[in-house]
Amino acid sequence: MKKLHLLVGCIWVLAFACGPQQDADNELLSVSETIDRIVTRMYAEWDSETLDTLSHDFIEQSLRPLEKESLATQYWKFQVNVPVTVSLMRDKAQKKIPFWLESSGFRRTPMEVKNEIYTYEVWQKDFNSGEVQLGINGFGKHRPVYFLALAPQNPSDELTVSPVFPQEQHIEQFREGAFTYHDWDGLVLTEVPESLQGQQLLTTIRGRAREAHLVDAFRSTDFPSGDRPDQLLLTWSEDPVRSIDIQWRTSENIAKGMVHYWKKGSTDTMQLEVDPYVMEDRLLQNDRYMHRFTAKLRGLDPGSAYGYRVGSISGAWSEVQSFSTAASQAVPFSFIWFGDVHNSAVWGNLIQKSERQHPATEFYFIAGDLVDTGLYRDDWDKLFTYAGETISRKPLLAVPGNHDSQDGLGAWMYEKMLSLPADSPVGMEGRSYAFTYQNTLFLMMDVTLPLSEQTAWLEKKLSESEATWKIAVFHFPPYNGVEPYTDIQDLWGPIFDRYQVDLVLGGHFHYYMRSQPIRNGQVQADPKDGTIYWISIGTTGKNKDIEREPYAAVQFPAEHLYQSITIDGKELRAETINLDGEQVDHFVLTK
């Protein structure tokens, strides 16, 4: 059983942006500000070869006194009302002990804490009442970061911990069965020393390893931005009948963006000027900053073809591209979907082949894991570059996967890369959303966010829809042969049954499976009586030794597949195609 008790990443992103403010060189800064300054200085003073060979000791020796103090005190802070003993659990596999740990008075004890994978040393220090200040996990990206347990030195005292930085700190009882990482809450403690049990456990996320990541950290993109617009991408954030969103990027030299667009056959050219979003990836040494533009075209004519180009008054322009709006009247339409693609060059070949083989396709979507690492902009550069001009002619939509929403830090880069509908649960705009295309309702759900906070919205959209076909798309497949998501089955399965959702599309596991119709957890003979759960893979395959699933209609090891679906009134025709253009599965549904 897989739990999805994930903490919303934005409260942890605050750790990268908040804390002491930068007013003068002699003031303590936040960890984020401190690392920003260090990285900027590194770029100015050291070449790429040096950046690629940095060691923990070299970095520590290069720190200025206030930088070192900030990194030793501003990572985790809280107030305690009584004297406490702080226990710090550090993964034994971490090669380098945090530079500040021993010098600040922490001492290693003989105790150990364990979960199914990691064994942690227990370090302890006594603190008086007042503020407790702790330092970074280290300069490496060691993902099982340290976590804390607190106990009053006087057992009769009642301990209160407040306020805490980062904000929204979760505190629970330190015990066997407790989780420590919100982005992996299925990983629970298996051994806790008796003397520590019942203390206050301060949980964390593995993404905190990235806050001071400098060793083996610097990257280069194969496709840096330039003054000429590239990465042209079409999406929707409103009605597909009368709107389109055009996105592109340039270097930071281009201060304003502009799109020229025209209805084909017309001599009238319209234009829209847009401001950039400045996107930083501070460890991307050859393209730290770039500008990303989004032009939202509205008031377009239904079922019409348009030409467009993007650029700026003072800079270069793209080649002319084209798009079409959706028809306002009921007509047949086709779309293509992919499972995980992981910014694969082979997937780029696959989507371009799919366009040639299915030129009538009106849009594409990816069921999560668009990239390997959602916070690495060089991975996004690969994704868009490998897709080529395909996504500048037909819209690309998506839902986030666990790789797009990295280590509990949220999917902010995904959100900035893709302009998506805001018809969403509160606070989940662009992550979970719905849109209707012709006679089909698409429910695009982000299951890396809490399910319970989306359930009422999901049911409301289904209850209000008069669409003939209903298709749900999300990354984690409820039915699979590796690790079934019983929480999705239990919470959303009855809703899919109640409103007769036709297809649930997903990925995550790298093989192919199309279920028989399922209702109330049981296989049904007639597709009209159940939902088909469908897993596919758009990149390299894995999971080759999965036993045959009892509910599977079709199942096989696979890689580099796409699915083309055509909806014509009350008929849905689907086929799965491999990289060689061969059909490997097909079926037809009718209403």
PLM feature segments, named:
Residues 1-24:
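Bacterial Sec-dependent N-terminal signal peptides
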Residues 74-76, 84-86, 242-246:
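Structural beta-strand segments of beta-rich domains
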Residues 124-138:
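Noncatalytic modules at the cell exterior or secretory-pathway interfaces
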Residues 158-337, 558, 567-591:
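Acidic, histidine-bearing metal-coordination/catalytic regions of metal-dependent phosphoesterases
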Residues 294, 305-322, 379-466, 491, ...:
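Extended active-site neighborhood of metal-dependent phosphoesterases/phosphodiesterases
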Residues 331-408:
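Conserved, compact domain cores that house catalytic/ligand-binding motifs in diverse enzymes
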Residues 337-339, 363-369, 395-402, 445-446, ...:
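Active-site neighborhood of phospho(di)ester-bond hydrolases with catalytic His/Asp-centered motifs
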Residues 465-509, 523-527:
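Active-site-proximal segments of metal-dependent phosphoesterases and phosphodiesterases across multiple
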